[in-house]
């Protein structure tokens, strides 16, 4: 089965073709991603209207290129899958309407994919990972620990009660006058800094709950920077290094408790694994801390290649293929959802907004 996938939930426009065989093994035939960093950089963050217009301008040619790279025509695909949420509503509409039109024109089944499910299942595409396993999703919009039991069977163990980790990186960068995107900029500066100079907080460390919190850490960065004005380059580097060290300690504590929870629930699991996905998973310091943690607990550490950690359409095509193996297609009347929790059974946390839980 060969699936055309489309991803337009935020600031990457993407199209891909993925093949899933009868044994459930996957192969990427093409994967095309166009970043909008240049469009959003002057504003220091993603502007939804600009993002939606950029998707409109680029998506048709990216779909054509994905088909060309896979040496296929639209008639050759077996189904079309697209991100239906969560994300920026304008971008979701562009991708979803395009996918529906292609599915209708080619008379192919259509599958609406939860963007978070795409991240959740990527390790099955890249590593053939069996169920169950743990997922740590760390990105600009999400920070979650999710227990992956099977297709459509997800339990959110913990989530951020305020800022997502990627957002904390971006806001820290902005406070310190670093360029957008903030995550890579903070990581680069941290290489030149002293991680022990500033004693920044480790939010929720030691608590039994499995949730995350990063707003207090971000506030501590602001207070530290304000006290040092004017900031030298070394001050900025030391703040970045101290911030990154605090994040690594916090993640190790929070994730470590989730690993223990997994062991208690699945004592006979022979292949316990932690999968890390999302753009923040590219941070080498955080990856090293999590690898050390997994080794200590006897878990495999799995981080898909960077181009599959960040937003892409191969993961959407793969999630569509996984669902197509056992489920009926979705209706072409299906609407996009700006907020779409991966685990819809979990109650939204206080502070998730009047519109409901985003994830």
UniProtKB/Swiss-Prot annotation:
It catalyses: L-threonylcarbamoyladenylate + adenosine(37) in tRNA = N(6)-L-threonylcarbamoyladenosine(37) in tRNA + AMP + H(+). It comes from the Bacteria. Its EC number is 2.3.1.234. Signal peptide: none annotated. InterPro entries: ATPase_NBD (IPR043129), Gcp-like_dom (IPR000905), KAE1/TsaD (IPR017861), TsaD (IPR022450). Keywords: Acyltransferase, Cytoplasm, Iron, Metal-binding, Transferase, tRNA processing. Residues 328-359 are annotated as: Disordered. The keyword Heme does not apply. Fe cation binds at residues 115, 119, 311. Substrate binds at residues 137-141, 170, 183, 283. Binds 1 Fe(2+) ion per subunit. It is found in: Cytoplasm. One of its GO terms (cellular component) is cytoplasm. CDD domains: ASKHA_NBD_TsaD_bac. GO terms for molecular function: iron ion binding; N(6)-L-threonylcarbamoyladenine synthase activity. Required for the formation of a threonylcarbamoyl group on adenosine at position 37 (t(6)A37) in tRNAs that read codons beginning with adenine. Is involved in the transfer of the threonylcarbamoyl moiety of threonylcarbamoyl-AMP (TC-AMP) to the N6 group of A37, together with TsaE and TsaB. TsaD likely plays a direct catalytic role in this reaction. NCBIfam families: gcp_kae1, T6A_TsaD_YgjD. This is tRNA N6-adenosine threonylcarbamoyltransferase. The lineage of its organism: Bacteria, Pseudomonadati, Pseudomonadota, Alphaproteobacteria, Hyphomicrobiales.
């Amino acid at each position: 089965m060969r699936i055309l996938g489309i991803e337009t939930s935020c600031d990457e426009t993407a199209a891909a073709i993925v093949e899933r065989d009868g044994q459930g093994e996957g192969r990427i035939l093409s994967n095309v991603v166009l970043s909008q960093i240049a469009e959003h950089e002057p504003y220091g963050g993603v502007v939804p209207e600009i993002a939606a217009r950029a998707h409109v301008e680029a998506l048709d040619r990216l779909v054509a290129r994905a088909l060309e790279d896979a040496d296929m025509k639209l008639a050759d695909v077996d189904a079309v899958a697209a991100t239906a949420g969560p994300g920026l509503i304008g971008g979701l509409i562009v991708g979803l309407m395009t996918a529906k039109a292609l599915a209708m024109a080619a008379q192919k089944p259509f599958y609406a994919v939860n963007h978070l499910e795409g991240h959740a299942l990527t390790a099955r595409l890249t590593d053939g990972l069996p169920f169950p396993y743990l997922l740590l999703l760390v990105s600009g919009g999400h920070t979650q620990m999710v227990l992956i039991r099977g297709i459509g069977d997800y339990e959110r163990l913990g989530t951020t009660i305020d800022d997502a980790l990627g957002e904390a990186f971006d806001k820290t960068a902005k406070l310190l006058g670093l360029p957008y995107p903030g995550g890579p900029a903070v990581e680069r500066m941290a290489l030149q800094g002293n991680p022990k100079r500033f004693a920044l907080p480790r939010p929720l460390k030691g608590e039994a709950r499995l949730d995350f919190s990063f707003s207090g850490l971000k506030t501590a960065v602001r207070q530290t920077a304000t006290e040092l004005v004017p900031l030298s380059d070394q001050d900025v580097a030391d703040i970045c290094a101290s911030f990154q060290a605090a994040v690594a300690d916090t993640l190790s504590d929070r994730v470590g408790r989730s690993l223990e929870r997994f062991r208690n629930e699945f004592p006979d699991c022979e292949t316990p694994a932690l999968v890390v996905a999302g753009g923040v998973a590219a941070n080498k310091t955080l990856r090293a801390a999590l690898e050390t943690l997994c080794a200590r607990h006897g878990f495999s550490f799995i981080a898909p290649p960077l181009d599959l950690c960040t937003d892409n359409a191969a993961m959407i095509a793969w999630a569509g293929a996984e669902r197509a193996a056992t489920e009926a297609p979705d209706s072409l009347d299906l609407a996009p959802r700006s907020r779409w929790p991966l685990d819809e059974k979990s109650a939204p946390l206080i502070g998730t907004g009047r519109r409901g839980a985003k994830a």
